[in-house]
């Protein structure tokens, strides 16, 4: 049997975020939360591993208390247990601190063979939590895996790197982050959704996990967020087509888009 933990992130729905016209800052108040899309691929792969080799599938997330309800989506997919790691200062924590909390939570679960996560989160897409977590747990890891073949002794992970396909063999315990191409996450039915709404979610705080406040002091603080403002130039040539084409070519050369213009 393979004991598997899926590490998921509950974050804002980036498709619903709007920008303040005056400050160019994102308006996050009132934006709904969602499970990061890539983490549903991780859950699907965990469930396929369970179907093949047995074991239990659990999900762990670190986030605000509001993340509880979104965890139920992963329970509905098939997770048998769900754990929420939170802290009063959660919004101030950096990746290193969150990694320490998640590592402590996974260790508290006991014997774990396989940790799966999405390649990155949909909000910041840094892709650093998987390697950080593997380092904190002291286990081998591979990121951006597009094909996973687990067996009783370990797993084979395949990923694309440029023009190459790399294949790795890892023993258990191991941590793997997965790309969206690896599978198509299942959609739970109504009975599974209703059943998930009744299952308990265990909540752990930093002190519960034995993580001291000093260990959570952020080394990096987010100073601010601003949207990128794209300025478009609408240049119209109202001449006859041959003359308009000539002016267009001259304009593109002047901008350095075509050869023969400014550098």
Regions found by a protein language model. Name each.
Residues 1-263:
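N-terminal glycine-rich FAD/FM-binding segment characteristic of electron-transfer flavoproteins
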